């Protein structure tokens, strides 16, 4: 991919609140097309961002753009300073992208940050965007796996450290003598039970799968299994970065032709559980700090009571004969 353009701009958002509708920035020309970020509340609770290609209808058939994005969310008082770095592939089917924020920002917290200074207009803040746009050569085909998907797949296989690490070196079914065919997909013996279970529960999953090349079919199936394995991890092991990669993986398997609406719902459930876990951890941390302060206060009170007892005892001590005379 050849770098097409670089742009840095600032979007000032005014009067943002939980009741706000979608807020659109003025379109910004970057390369040969116009882009705009979109801000909106989710269920009146969370702050969310999107990036959209505005004039995609004027672009040639088969267009594609790869975007690297760096965002900084900041208020005038600088008490709010959040940085986001992400990337995404845009094409005719994907003209709007929900930017993955590492942690969902509760609007109540956002408003607290925005409103805490008397010198800042309520609900006003700015988003500083730095965008690099690359022209993508073609879109996903049978012989072209997207760079990001390939990178994640290779990383996943390397991290697993199992026998499927040699899979990418194999180019034909004849060389895959240790593989088993399941519904037209060559998989390892250890994966057969899982793949069969997927087809039993979701028989139409590969109805629209387009790839004929066996190497690509196998790679896509490994990618699907890796995504499912990610969702099976415990929340303690699952990071926000893992969920961002899971979003990318889901987009990839959908573009390859797998019907995975059921998996998308499961991913949303895991995201929701992760958010609840993080909120619970935050509340637990606050309670622990509060309890620690209470214990310190109790300790201080114990010392004060002990001191008062000593002083009271001294006060109650009767005077001796010598003291009186």
Swiss-Prot record:
Protein name as annotated: MATH domain and coiled-coil domain-containing protein At3g58430
Coiled coil spans: 258-306
Record bears the keyword Methyltransferase: no
Domain MATH: 6-131
Keywords from the UniProt entry: Coiled coil
Nucleus as UniProt keyword: no
PANTHER family: MEPRIN AND TRAF-LIKE DOMAIN-CONTAINING PROTEIN-RELATED, TRAF-LIKE SUPERFAMILY PROTEIN
SUPFAM superfamilies noted in UniProt: TRAF domain-like (SSF49599)
């Amino acid at each position: 991919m050849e770098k097409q353009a670089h742009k840095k701009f600032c979007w000032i958002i005014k009067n943002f609140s939980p009741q706000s509708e979608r807020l659109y920035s003025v379109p910004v020309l970057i390369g040969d097309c116009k882009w705009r970020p979109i801000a909106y509340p989710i269920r009146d609770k969370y702050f969310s961002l999107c990036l959209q290609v505005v004039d995609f209808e004027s672009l040639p058939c088969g267009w594609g753009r790869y975007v690297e994005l760096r965002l900084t969310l900041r208020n005038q008082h600088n008490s709010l300073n959040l940085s986001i770095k992400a990337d995404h592939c845009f094409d005719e089917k994907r003209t709007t992208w929900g930017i993955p924020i590492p942690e969902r920002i509760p609007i109540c917290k956002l408003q607290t940050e925005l409103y805490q200074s008397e010198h800042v207009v309520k609900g006003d803040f700015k988003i500083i965007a730095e965008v690099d746009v690359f022209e993508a050569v073609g879109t996903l085909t049978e012989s072209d796996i997207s760079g990001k998907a390939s990178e994640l797949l290779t990383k996943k296989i390397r991290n697993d450290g199992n026998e499927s690490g040699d899979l990418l070196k194999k180019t034909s079914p004849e060389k895959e003598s240790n593989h088993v065919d399941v519904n037209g997909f060559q998989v390892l013996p250890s994966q057969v039970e899982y793949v069969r279970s997927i087809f039993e529960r979701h028989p139409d999953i590969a109805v629209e799968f387009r790839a004929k090349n066996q190497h690509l079919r196998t790679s896509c199936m490994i990618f699907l299994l890796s995504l499912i394995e990610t969702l099976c991890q415990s929340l303690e092991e699952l990071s926000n970065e893992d969920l961002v990669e899971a979003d990318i993986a889901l987009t990839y398997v959908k573009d390859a032709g797998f019907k995975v609406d059921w998996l998308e719902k499961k991913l949303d459930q895991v995201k929701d559980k992760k958010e609840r876990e993080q909120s619970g951890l935050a509340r637990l941390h606050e309670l622990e700090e509060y309890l620690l302060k209470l214990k310190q206060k109790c300790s201080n009170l114990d010392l004060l009571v002990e001191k008062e007892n000593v002083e009271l005892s001294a006060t109650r001590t009767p005077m001796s004969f010598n003291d009186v005379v």
